[in-house]
């Protein structure tokens, strides 16, 4: 059996510590500094998720700030759109599979993708498309087209318990003996909901776990919010003789409950801090609509000999992408609070008055 190597597994460092006071003036000074430095010190990153929601700034203030941070950058504009309330992503046709790095391949059905980390001892697959048919008819042939042997898939790391990410996992387990990995909270979610194509419970992912296969180590971080057990990995990516550090953000759309959005915000802050320490300079998403993913694949495909790789955004670019996630989440939380306030005010205005005495 291909058990994950756990000798290097350790929890990620705690992000707790003293929280400096933050005035409204300081709030916007930090925002201005972030726009110039593109991620040197995240806006409000030193506040807790709960405390950040007490500001008088409106949801639209946050949305405007996110748009300002994005500017004309299509990668950043994509995540602003993806986190905007009411956004409905397009369903483009599936692109041809592509090695976006020497050791990283993407096989996509257009609106959701699987990412293969190619190692000296086989494949670590991140997500498995929508269903067994897509795994068999798109994922497996796509890997073969890129010179990767699907029979060497050793692990399927499922970022979260939604069908468009786990759908093909059990097929890969049954066909190739791959081990399926998911955070405990999302294994529990599958057990509760019992959705179609759910994989049989296999390996739990610990926060900060290091999964080593051959010459490659992938670090798996718990980033709950999109679901209770969302996971986001760091991975090495080789390009033109240099090894970079990439990340894949495991969940996109904010959940309905305000408390879950606050959890999502806390995860984004923690993950961005870990990214800084790891010098992450590559940003990926399992949903290409959230980061201009399909377009960047075509840029790379059309210029295969270019020294530049559009997925290498630099440490500041990766931080700015996460800064926009943070800022949009603050806006979504503020919008929830505004809706609650409006409802309370309306009820108070229409409720009958009680007697004033006796």
Model-predicted regions and their roles:
Residues 1-22, 33-41:
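N-terminal secretory signal peptides
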Residues 2, 28, 32, 58, ...:
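C-terminal regulatory/interaction regions
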Residues 42-44, 48-122, 132, 356-358:
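Zn-dependent metallo-beta-lactamase
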Residues 56-68, 104, 133-137, 143-210, ...:
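Active-site HxH/HxHxD metal-binding segment of metal-dependent hydrolases
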Residues 123, 130-132, 200, 210-212, ...:
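Metallo-beta-lactamase
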